[in-house]
């Protein structure tokens, strides 16, 4: 059946039965219903702000600043180019291929489940949700930059950021845990492959020394610059928390 958006839609029931994955689908739905929503205006506000990519623009700007500050222009441009490739590939695989190919409804669009889902601000997302492009993008960025910069503290921060974004998608009811899990695998895989491509190009065309110092990471990034990134991340979390509390106050009047 072709839906109004032009996608070929397969019957989810017949597809699931033919692939013998109905038990997995049932478990996915059960997990989603446990994660989705709450009676808390605070958490509604937190997840709503956290899932918005515009919230994280200051963090992205500081990351770009640190990359250019700690590398020669040629290598910085190579890193940015590879990062753009990570984002493009993860997004195209998730949204351009997987969503129309598998045609799995988002929980908020699934006729069998949509009225059991708690939604925030009327947001339901697009028709299909497998796999999550948010998860693919954020985990792809997290693994790529973690391998590039080689800082444990930054790696923990980047994966925390990716996890917050991924969890917010389930909380808002626009993705099943399975959507997130598969999107995460795609992101980690693409991020790692592009890092391998980056190291090949870097060794062939750019010579950069390894650093052994308590002031630098092993790839030459000042630890003080890493601290700036962490500080901006913490400020962003505070911004989300304050925004969540403001949502509570405004809802009372």
Question: Locations of the language-model features?
Answer:
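Alpha-helical membrane-inserting segments
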Residues: 63, 89-98, 190-202
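Hydrophobic alpha-helical transmembrane segments
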Residues: 50-67, 81, 134-137, 157
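N-terminal transmembrane-helix/juxtamembrane module of multi-pass inner/ER membrane proteins
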Residues: 7, 12-58, 94-124, 246-253
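N-terminal signal-anchor transmembrane alpha helix
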Residues: 20, 81-101, 234-241
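Transmembrane helix interruption/hinge and helix-loop junction motifs
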Residues: 53-54, 72-73, 149-153
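Interfacial segments of alpha-helical transmembrane regions
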Residues: 65-93, 154-156
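Membrane-embedded catalytic cores of phosphoryl/pyrophosphoryl-handling enzymes
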Residues: 118-252
């Amino acid at each position: 059946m072709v839906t109004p958006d032009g996608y070929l839609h397969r019957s989810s029931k017949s597809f699931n039965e033919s692939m013998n994955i109905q038990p997995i689908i049932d478990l996915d739905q059960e997990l989603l219903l446990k994660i989705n929503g709450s009676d808390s205006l605070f958490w509604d506000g937190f997840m709503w702000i956290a899932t918005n990519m515009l919230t994280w623009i200051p963090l992205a700007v500081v990351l770009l600043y640190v990359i250019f500050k700690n590398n020669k222009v040629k290598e910085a441009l190579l890193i940015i180019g590879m990062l753009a490739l990570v984002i493009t590939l993860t997004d195209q695989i998730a949204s351009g291929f997987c969503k129309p190919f598998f045609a799995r409804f988002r929980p908020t669009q699934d006729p069998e489940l949509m009225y059991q889902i708690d939604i925030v601000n009327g947001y339901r997302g697009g028709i299909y949700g497998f796999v999550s492009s948010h998860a693919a993008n954020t985990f792809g960025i997290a693994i790529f930059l973690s391998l590039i910069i080689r800082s444990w503290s930054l790696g923990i921060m980047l994966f925390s950021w990716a996890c917050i974004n991924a969890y917010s998608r389930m909380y808002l009811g626009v993705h099943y845990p399975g959507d997130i899990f598969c999107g995460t695998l795609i992101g980690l895989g693409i991020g790692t492959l592009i890092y391998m491509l980056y190291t090949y190009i870097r060794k062939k065309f750019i010579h950069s020394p390894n650093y052994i110092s308590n002031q630098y990471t092993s790839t030459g990034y000042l630890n003080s610059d890493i601290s700036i990134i962490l500080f901006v991340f913490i400020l962003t979390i505070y911004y989300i928390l304050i925004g969540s509390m403001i949502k509570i106050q405004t809802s009372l009047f």
